[in-house]
Design a protein with these regions (language model features):
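C-terminal catalytic lobe of FAD-dependent flavoproteins
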Residues: 171, 304, 320-400
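Helical element adjacent to the flavin cofactor pocket in flavoenzyme catalytic cores
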Residues: 130, 137-138, 166-227
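N-terminal Rossmann-like FAD-binding beta1-loop-alpha1 element of flavoenzymes
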Residues: 24-49
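Flavin (FAD/FMN) cofactor-binding and adjacent substrate-gating region
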Residues: 2-7, 73-79, 103-183, 191
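Extreme N-terminal leader/targeting segments of oxidoreductases
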Residues: 1-24
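Flavin-dependent oxidoreductases
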Residues: 203-287
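Glycine-rich FAD pyrophosphate-binding loop
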Residues: 42-62
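Active-site lid/adjacent beta-loop-alpha segment flanking the redox-cofactor pocket in flavoenzymes
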Residues: 263-356
Length: 400
């Protein structure tokens, strides 16, 4: 298994061992953890930052690199589940997240191939077409750009593959996910964050704010950190160190592949079949394709990053629906573990039953739609004691 985005990457900072103290500890060096560490460092708090593997090695470096607005549900469904006003507010948070990420690319000069070409949602069946059209109408009514493409408006490559209707969302974007996260990490360390990669958390004992003990293990030996506050940004793995999340965030595996570079074909990231199928063509010309876990959902649960032969084969069959891709060599295959919350929304803020510990997890396959802002919100919670974002996605909604 060879994740395309992670080629040649490894830990660049020493593992932690021995006894340490810290005012604030951040656990996890994906997008959310990098954002939190950066914001805390810029606030002058110099957080101690721990990562089991290396920066971006988890889902943040194994996804398709989409920067999308909204949740995993189409907007019309989101309205049906959470109500019009809350759906509008949540969608607005994801738009703000994208704008903040774009600002970070510019501010820190991150070379990550960021582009804002929009995204395209395609329908695979008549009922999905109706849902797409309804979502486009509701988005427009609520002030979000959405353009219906059908007939000649839909590019020929999609019509030739059997698609008839799509909705283009012009405010969405794309990037090289690992490069973006590592660019944030570099900025965080330069601002004062103290990063230790290759450092696994073996225990977290929260006696109260100001009295949290973290025990670690690494190639350098065991370690103990006594912290005043801890920010957990481990998404799918949160339940391993915080029992509160064991029945609230499920680890769900996603299959991915990439081809050798081919001639330009797709103009923006694409979602189809209610988001179960997704692909894009990156700046190097490679087709990066993922999804199809609905073919065998029971087996795609868990944290083992393994390939599913049947799903991988189905992904190749799908590629061959596009004549220009029938001879494209597959150069990379990999999987990654996402954290799906029980209600499809991020879970942020103080962790019930763990005083002194806060978390931002459960991004449900849309980490690049929410996690950057979530990390900033966690830092705001530490520094100022409150955050509107945290209020919107508080873990308290499960503590009833």
């Amino acid at each position: 298994m060879n994740p395309y985005w992670l080629e040649g990457l490894a830990a660049q900072t020493p593992a932690l061992s021995g006894e340490h103290g810290a005012d604030v500890v951040v656990i996890g060096a994906g997008l959310c953890g990098a954002s939190a560490a950066l914001a805390l460092a810029e606030a002058g708090l110099n957080p101690l930052w721990l990562e089991r593997g290396f920066v971006s090695v988890g889902a943040s470096g194994r996804n398709a690199g989409f920067v999308l607005q909204g949740t995993a549900e189409r907007y019309s469904r989101a309205i049906g589940v959470m109500g019009r006003e809350r759906a509008r507010r949540v969608h607005g948070w994801s738009r703000e997240n994208h704008l903040a990420m774009a600002d970070a690319v510019q501010r820190f000069g991150i070379d990550c191939g960021y582009q804002r070409r929009g995204s395209l949602q395609l329908a695979c069946a008549p009922e999905e077409e109706a849902e797409l059209l309804e979502s486009a109408a509701r988005l427009a009514e609520d002030g979000f750009a959405a353009d219906v493409w059908s007939g000649a408006d839909l590019p020929a490559c999609y019509r030739d593959a059997g698609f008839h209707v799509g909705v283009h969302l012009p405010d969405d974007g794309e990037l090289h996910p690992a490069r973006f996260v590592r660019g944030l990490a570099k900025a965080a360390v330069e601002a004062g964050a103290v990063l230790h990669e290759g450092t696994a958390i073996t225990a977290l004992d929260a006696q109260g704010a100001g009295d949290v003990t973290i025990r670690t293990s690494s190639a350098a030996g065991t370690g103990t950190v006594r912290a005043s506050l801890v920010v957990v940004c481990t998404n799918a793995y949160a339940g391993e160190i915080l029992p509160f999340f064991a029945d609230k965030v499920d680890p769900v595996r996603g299959q991915m592949l990439a081809t050798a570079p081919v001639a330009p074909l797709f103009g923006c990231p694409v979602y189809a079949d209610h988001g179960y199928d997704y692909w894009r063509q990156d700046e190097a010309g490679r087709i990066v394709l993922g999804g199809w876990r609905n073919l065998d959902p029971a087996s795609e649960v868990g944290t083992a990053e393994v390939l599913h032969d049947g799903i991988q084969a189905r992904m190749v069959e799908f590629l061959h629906r596009f004549p220009a891709l029938r001879e494209a060599p597959i150069t990379h295959r990999w999987s990654g573990t996402m954290g799906f919350s029980r209600d499809g929304l991020p879970i942020c803020g103080a962790v019930p039953g763990a005083p002194g510990v806060m978390a931002a997890v459960g991004f449900t396959g849309h980490g690049f739609g929410f996690a950057y802002l979530a990390g900033q919100a966690m830092a705001q919670l530490v520094v100022e004691g409150r955050s509107d974002f945290v209020d919107a996605f508080s873990a308290r909604r499960f503590a009833v």
